[in-house]
Amino acid sequence: MRGCLQSVKWLTSALRPSQSLASSTRYPRRLLSTSAPRNAQVRKPASEVEQRIAAIPIERFRNFCIVAHVDHGKSTLSDRLLELTGTIEAGANKQVLDKLDVERERGITVKAQTCSMLYNHQGEDYLLHLVDTPGHVDFRAEVSRSYASCGGALLLVDASQGIQAQTVANFYLAFAEGLKLVPVINKVDLPSADPQRALDQMKNTFELDPESAVLVSAKTGLNVSQLLPTVIEQIPAPVGDRTKPLRMLLVDSWYSTYKGVILLVRLFDGEIRAGDQVVSFATGLKYTVGEVGIMYPGQTAQSVLRAGQVGYIYFNPAMKRSQEAKVGDTYTKVGSERLVQPLPGFEEPKAMVFVAAYPVDASDFPHLEDSINQLILNDRSVTLQKESSEALGAGFRLGFLGTLHCSVFEDRLRQEHGASIIITPPTVPFKVIWKDGKEEIITNPALFPEEDTLRAKVTELQEPFVLATLTFPEEYLGRVIELCESNRGEQKSLEFFTSTQVILKYELPLAQLVDDFFGKLKGSTKGYASLDYEESGWRRSNISKLQLLVNKVPVDAVSRVVHSSQVQRLGRLWVSKFKEHVDRQMFEVVIQAAAGRNVVARESIKPFRKDVLQKLHAADVTRRKKLLEKQKEGRKKLKAVGNVVIEHKAFQAFLAK
């Protein structure tokens, strides 16, 4: 075995550096997989890179990220910057920092990715560290963590679309972190581009100087070369002292099959090398460092990481449990605990959307469990609980930050792990205030109190609300207000920030938001609207549990807590849709939707009818009555003791979007 490994090592070392680099960039690494590619180090001439980095003082470090709305060109601009600095080959790469299949398919960034770049400006080398952050509200935890490791940001706006909801939200996140913002207008090459409008919006909305803006086209590379000198001149260098005791912030982590948990870290003070012993302030656990390095663009080992740098480390022996890597934790060297003040951490993201996931085939449960656990190693914001359903068997209740987060996770389960799953519609948590003063948050509709308990022991029921910010052209204002009002919204503000664009703020129930509100909004505005939201607390609400009953027996997999205004509509929809997928039986099947004790909708499936009168003489009336009566009694008995057989595919079809 050792001989095999040595021969592989000999083969890889025999490759010319240019060959190795070309192959690694032509087939970009999927850095978030738990398989080998993330662990494979990029074979660059490390000594040359390391010598250049060693000669650069902290005053010539720049840590920056790109702040933008979804689809405004962050990942494409990142590619151009990596090409410009020679980190990757020009033209051979598409979205180098978007590693996941789902990111490339949807054109979105899900995980924050990082890369170090070396750039010579006016005869001096600079070490630039770029973070490509997600733009969507569901991945805000990724965004805020990334900002903590940066000193400035490029505020990117699409010249054809102008400022959008998530541009505003991400601007305020970056502003709150104290980042220096450089305005950049992208896609100026488009026929529909209006750079002046975008500059005016930046000035009016964010009070940014239009004179300092850089107008670029990330796709064609136009003016991109002006960006890096602007970054160097306008974004401040990180502050740190390499002679002080180590103070290191954990920004992110991912799991490797071979190396255990790998940590992405930002050094504020001191330096770290392989062999150093470090201790976590959050857990008190001690580790020996196995390797340190930078992302260039893959893992590139270094002999040392210094104050001001962002890089990766892993331990030897390995950190095996990803739960030990608490994002926002501070590490220092063993013996320096009393000399170092821990850095302020990050707020843990709270799951706000819940679904149940079941395998289509019950025998696939172990595979599904293994697949979910592997994905959760790289996404700690997902919550996981085992649950069981009489109808669908063993499964899991999963909690997500939002509906896109949920949808991306589902896509990754199917694409990366080949999972065949049934996913229930998304639900939101509800708060129960009991008469004895206790409060309980319920995330599973099956655990919602029954009617008798509600009347006897519950004081109040509450549901979560969000403050939604919607931006869209003025011509769609009437339709959008109508949509928000029909979804139990309450208008908070209306603002015209250009002659044609509107910013509308509404408080909406989260339950309405996850019920395809964004899809309806896009339909009402022909795709021109954007949406961002933040939590707005809990409010008293008239809610009840809606259940589906088959022959008066509740189907546990299909229950939902809804507002009283939605009960009738949803109940009728459920029974008519479920009827389409249930096969006829030897007895009548009654499908009902019930809220508490009230049946709000009903459908019946007629039984198969055996002709018991086939052999009778037409005149034999008494015999005819007797046989029909007997058949009727037999059906009653069968209905009383018989179980309705509902195929798995019926649930699959019913729960399908």
From Swiss-Prot:
Transmembrane segments: none annotated. GTP binds at residues 68-75, 132-136, 186-189. One of its GO terms (cellular component) is mitochondrial inner membrane. It comes from the Eukaryota. InterPro entries: EF-4, EFG_III/V, EFG_V-like, G_TR_CS, LepA_C_sf, LepA_CTD, LepA_IV, P-loop_NTPase. GO terms for molecular function: GTP binding; GTPase activity; mitochondrial ribosome binding. Its main location: mitochondrion. It is found in: Mitochondrion inner membrane. The keyword Mitochondrion applies. PANTHER family: TRANSLATION FACTOR GUF1, MITOCHONDRIAL, TRANSLATION FACTOR GUF1-RELATED. Belongs to the TRAFAC class translation factor GTPase superfamily. Classic translation factor GTPase family. LepA subfamily. This is Translation factor GUF1, mitochondrial. The lineage of its organism: Eukaryota, Fungi, Dikarya, Ascomycota, Pezizomycotina.
